[in-house]
From Swiss-Prot:
GO biological process per UniProt: 'de novo' IMP biosynthetic process
Pathway: Purine metabolism; IMP biosynthesis via de novo pathway; N(2)-formyl-N(1)-(5-phospho-D-ribosyl)glycinamide from N(1)-(5-phospho-D-ribosyl)glycinamide (formate route): step 1/1
Family from the record: Belongs to the PurK/PurT family.
Gene name of the encoded protein: purT
Annotated ATP-grasp domain residues: 119-308
Annotated source species: Pseudomonas syringae pv. syringae (strain B728a)
Protein name: Formate-dependent phosphoribosylglycinamide formyltransferase
Keyword Lipoprotein attached: no
MF annotations from Gene Ontology: ATP binding; magnesium ion binding; phosphoribosylglycinamide formyltransferase 2 activity; phosphoribosylglycinamide formyltransferase activity
Annotated Gene Ontology cellular component terms: cytosol
Amino acid sequence: MTQIGTPLSPTATRVLFCGSGELGKEVVIELQRLGVEVIAVDRYENAPAMQVAHRSHVINMLDGAALRAVIEAEKPHFIVPEIEAIATATLVELEAEGFTVIPTARAAQLTMNREGIRRLAAEELKLPTSPYHFADTFEAYSKAVEDLGFPCVVKPVMSSSGKGQSLLKSTDDVQKAWDYAQEGGRAGKGRVIVEGFIDFDYEITLLTVRHIGGTTFCAPVGHRQEKGDYQESWQPQAMSPVALAESERVAKAVTEALGGRGMFGVELFIKGDQVWFSEVSPRPHDTGLVTLISQDLSQFALHARAILGLPIPLIRQFGPSASAVILVEGQSTQTAFANLGAALAEPDTALRLFGKPEVNGQRRMGVALARDESIEAARAKATRASQAVNVEL
């Protein structure tokens, strides 16, 4: 049986977050509601989740020694990776020493790198994926492009939020896509994956939670991406029963192989009744922000319950819902948001402003949420709310 102590006392249940962005912030809030003591770690000060945690630490999370020092000092009952860019080899060591990593250290390690998870899905689990090659050099990359043909997609094996990702349509794109991939990788220059392009009808995120009572799926989330970054999402995405059943089969196979407990965002391509595995995040997913308005238990509440070993008997869906991001472009350390009354004037709308301490270039600083009678109406309403927000840099 799960027992939760008193925060900041010897009986406290301590959860440490590696990464403190807007997704982590919502999970921290859910854990705070259950009386959990939360420690937030990131590479910069005043990150969103730090603002709602009991305390925080600023370290380079790719530095294994620094990560180990914080974890050994804090002695958390649960370590929760919130981003990919972490010294995952250190998490594997810590797990072997008795710490609990959510969902598992292996899941964090495999999904930090597109190669690990692609080989697991395609080669071990024999799940349908796009055709692919990995390449370390421009020569190997050029050969991979030639082999797969146009159009094709190139991504650094280590990157997030679409960084370094390109769609190649002709030989004119080959050099610039390689250069962009080399700039966009998280751990510096290097290896890329080249994928054959799947002419899909739509893509979904199947939010899949592994918990004490088994595996539960949220209704499928549809989304629209630009340059690999999510702009809007909606739930439920209309699908054929065959495609939905196959999506759940694929998601269950991948999440079972990764193991542990927690929320997983499984990204899939759909064409008719066909399903291809794309990627998986072993944590809440940005497109799943829509669940803040679409479900009685958001993906963040579900993650918190799963982490703590609490049951998830039912997920109630409230009907057609959507999210639209609030993107800010420019430079500021004192961004202000105005016209919020207009943004929230319609019924069944909500806003989340993430409280990020600065913007330098383009950054997702918030999200508008809406429910309506249809997906089209919910999307339009969320977009109206998002566009109504005036940003002052």
